[in-house]
Regions:
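Short glycine-rich phosphate-binding loop at a beta-alpha junction
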Residues: 52-65, 143-146, 251, 255-269
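Glycine-rich phosphate-binding loops at beta-strand->alpha-helix junctions
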Residues: 259-286
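Glycine-rich phosphate-binding/hydrolytic loop that grips phosphoryl groups
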Residues: 151, 194, 270, 289-366
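Small-residue (GG/TT-enriched) beta-loop-alpha framework at ligand/catalytic clefts
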Residues: 3-18, 34, 52-53, 114-220, ...
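Internal amphipathic helical hairpin motif
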Residues: 63-121
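Primarily periplasmic coiled-coil/stalk helices
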Residues: 187-194, 198-236, 240-243, 352, ...
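Hydrophobic, leucine-rich alpha helices that serve as N-terminal signal-anchor/transmembrane segments
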Residues: 169, 182, 325-407
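N-terminal phosphate-binding loop and adjacent alpha-helix
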Residues: 25-51
Length: 407
């Protein structure tokens, strides 16, 4: 049984969800939203309230940059990696970026427009921002640092025969294009829920109240406006921003050669009632739905809408439980974490990973200080021994060479 605490951080809001995985079953142990002013204090509070002191944590990065590179599908893996590095360095020169200040990752997909090429989704983040995240979670089991636009598909129930957009309206809006069930493209918009909340907050002087106002607001399509019984004083803040977002989504759809069958809406703005119908009208009838985590069903205790509010955090928790893209983690693990992974790996021969196969298992508490001391001591002792043997071999080789020369 493994658990992961997903924490999604925006400028004023933190969303969190702790997910436990047992075999193929997923369970939400705890979730919630907090408006914060002191980030470190709020993180400590969430870890304490969810009893996640020993659980791994998965968080988002912000303001990451996306670039798209197109390569021949005939390149070897080694040549492809070199070509991607060279292309990105050229982009940095063109855009006047310092490549040494950036940490980058990439994913490879088939180019839908040219079958002889592959498309590289290249993601770069400022190293200073990554280091700040590491500092914010110092002393905690931070496992994953991942772009939210690439983790949000983790919770979608995708259809191999459909192409979809996931419009995640958090502080800023990300648009993730899925071809079948695979990520194909990401577009970030400058407009998002932050504009709505900031404008309401300026009037109410409470970010929490601004969020609650959005939850209690219903917007209507042109046909349903007559059903609105009273004027909502806050629609003037909400509707214009949603209109801007919807039109930019429409532009993305129009510019793509891929036919979009469905649009999923999620994020902070998804708490606004009827937002899916509003978008569907503006997107000329393309089916729009609120994104629901694939493994969660309505219950008498908790309404599924409560889970939907923390979709971003749930997707991050799933990322920490090894769902989604495996090579998008911006967290560089230290030596101890790598050793723990190695010691905890399934090395059973003759069975699939994760299967019990009736064999005995050894349970080692890798967080024990004594175990750490023992492992690290023997680890470095082994390195020292190998180094001594290597030097001895070199001395013997030189001695043997001189002996042959004298003879």
């Amino acid at each position: 049984m493994a658990s992961c605490l997903g924490i999604y951080i925006d400028s004023n809001i933190i969303k969190y969800a702790k997910i436990t995985k047992e075999k193929d079953d997923l369970k939400v142990d705890a979730f919630g939203i907090k408006i914060y002013s002191d980030l470190l204090q709020t993180i400590d509070q969430i870890v304490s309230e969810t009893f996640s002191f020993k659980d791994q944590i998965s968080v988002n990065i912000t303001d990451e940059m996306y670039d798209y590179l197109y390569m021949s599908d005939l390149l070897s893996k080694k040549d492809l990696a070199k070509a991607i590095e060279t292309e990105f360095e050229s982009l940095c020169v063109e855009k006047q970026y310092n490549p040494n200040a950036l940490e980058s990752r990439y994913a490879i997909v088939n180019d839908q427009n040219d079958k002889t090429k592959i498309k590289v989704i290249h993601v770069a983040e400022n190293k200073m921002k990554i280091n700040q995240i590491l500092q914010n979670f110092d002393g905690k089991r931070l496992q994953n640092i991942t772009p939210i636009a690439l983790t949000i598909p983790n919770i979608a129930q995708t259809n191999e025969k459909e192409n979809a957009l996931i419009v995640n309206i958090e502080d800023k809006t990300s648009i993730t294009t899925l071809v079948g069930s695979k990520i194909y493209d990401v577009q970030n918009l400058d407009v998002g829920a932050q504009q709505i909340l900031d404008e309401i907050n300026a009037k109410e002087n409470s970010y929490l109240k601004a969020y609650e106002i959005c939850k209690n607001t219903t917007i209507y399509t042109m046909e349903g406006q007559g059903l609105q019984q009273q004027e909502n004083d806050y629609l003037g803040y909400i509707v214009p921003n949603l209109f801007t977002i919807a039109n930019q989504v429409k532009d993305v759809i129009g510019a793509s050669l891929i036919k979009i069958n469905k649009v999923y809406i999620t994020g902070t703005a998804s708490v606004i009632n009827n937002i899916d119908l509003y978008f569907e009208e503006l997107l000329d009838g393309i089916k729009c739905e609120i994104l629901k985590p694939f493994f969660i069903e309505d219950s008498q205790k908790i309404n599924i809408k409560d889970y939907i509010e923390v979709n971003s955090a749930i997707s991050l928790a799933l990322q920490g439980l090894e769902y989604g893209l495996a090579n998008m983690n911006f967290n560089k693990k230290n030596t101890w974490e790598q050793l723990k992974e190695t010691l905890g790996s399934d090395i059973t021969i003759g069975g699939k990973k994760g299967k019990d196969n009736g064999k005995k298992k050894i349970n080692i508490n890798l967080n024990s200080p004594k175990v750490k001391q023992w492992v690290m001591r023997d680890f470095f002792r082994s390195i020292s021994t190998i180094s001594c043997l290597w030097r001895a071999c070199n001395v013997y080789r030189l001695w043997n060479a001189r002996k042959r020369k004298r003879n």
